[in-house]
Amino acid sequence: YFGSVGGGVWKTDDGGLEWSNVSDGYFQMGSVGAVAVSESDPNVIYAGMGESDIRPVMTSHGDGVYRSNDAGKTWSNVGLKKSRTISNIVIHPKDHNTLLVGVQGDQYKPSIDRGLYHSNDGGKNWKKVLYVNETTGISGLTMDRNNPRILYASTWDHLRKPWQMRSGGKGSGIYKSIDGGLNWKKLETGLPKIMGKTDVSVSGANSDIVYVIAEAEKSGLYRSDNGGKSFKLINSDRVLIARSWYYIHVFADPSDENVVYVLNA
């Protein structure tokens, strides 16, 4: 499955040779910011709407979260309709009804709907579990594959105007939860005091290793070897953070603790 900027959700059954749209007729908006497939039941898929990689030109908004129970054949909206932009979705590996959704929020004005939301009933009810301020949304979210109660989230303080794109502020940061996302603690040791857009990823091979890619005065790739207690800048090559305010992601390899992937524009 992949979510497109303007064409909904698409699916392939042959490893990517051919793709077909599976959301037409069900989605009210065409822009998808996140897609997640349940490990416990691959028929269950969640799609978060709204273009999460924003630019000074046209950026499309969305209308919440959609869920499919039949591998994409049909969809229904399950809430967060005021979110405007969703950047991340993670599903509990053993319970497809428990998930967290990162809301980046309205790109053009302050909004109290930003933040991280938790549901334990498949989207029937939502609880906001992490909120910083009206201009700070969620830009990254990762779950420890070895312990799904441990999660990391990155927040992004930003605002776009027709004449300006502001990326960064006191609201940007990295947070950790050890209770399934209900409570969060900010991680600061070794990280820049003021950051722009960031992303975070915990290693599936070694839960102590956490990577952060950060837009900041000291931009680059940061690594923690103690579960986020402290971080160290390990690579400041500017190629890693090119146009970071637009598109920046980091993924730790699930099986090799020394392999990490950084994506940018």
Enumerate the language-model features and the residues they cover.
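Beta-propeller blade termini and top-face loops
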Residues: 1-265
